Swiss-Prot record:
Protein name, UniProt field: Na(+)/H(+) antiporter subunit F1
Biological role: Mnh complex is a Na(+)Li(+)/H(+) antiporter involved in Na(+) and/or Li(+) excretion. Na(+)/H(+) antiport consumes a transmembrane electrical potential, and is thus inferred to be electrogenic. Does not transport K(+), Ca(2+) or Mg(2+).
InterPro entries xref list: MrpF/PhaF-like (IPR007208)
Regulation: Na(+) extrusion is completely inhibited by the H(+) conductor carbonyl cyanide m-chlorophenylhydrazone (CCCP).
Gene: mnhF1
Organism ancestry: Bacteria, Bacillati, Bacillota, Bacilli, Bacillales
Entry keyword annotation includes Transport: yes
Entry's Gene Ontology molecular function annotations: sodium:proton antiporter activity
NCBIfam families noted in UniProt: PRK12600.1 (NF009248)
């Protein structure tokens, strides 16, 4: 079996998985479920880009993959802080600078 066929099959599987996560984003039930589903979609998007870069032999796409990973991590970290404290940026009223 040609390796291109295997990559295309993997792409189809990942895209189907992304559609399932998109349903979770729309239906919920909670905000935390939606954020976790969005994070999973980010990881799956990284996999799709990696598979396309292998299929098309494009080596510089690793930079795009890393940027998506960083943005997904920051989004999850910001949301977890929001869930914990109710706000993202805290202003210290006692700070005298």
């Amino acid at each position: 079996m040609n390796h291109n066929v295997i990559i295309v099959i993997a792409l189809i599987i990942v895209v189907i998985s992304m559609l399932a996560m998109l349903i979770r984003v729309v239906l919920g039930p909670s905000l935390a479920d939606r954020v976790v589903a969005l994070d999973a979609i980010g990881l799956q998007l990284m996999a799709v880009i990696a598979l396309f870069s292998i299929l098309l032999n494009i080596k510089y796409m690793i930079v795009v993959i890393m940027m998506i990973g960083i943005l997904a991590f920051l989004g999850t970290a910001v949301f977890s802080k929001f869930m914990d404290k109710g706000k993202v940026i805290e202003h210290d009223q006692n700070h005298t600078d």
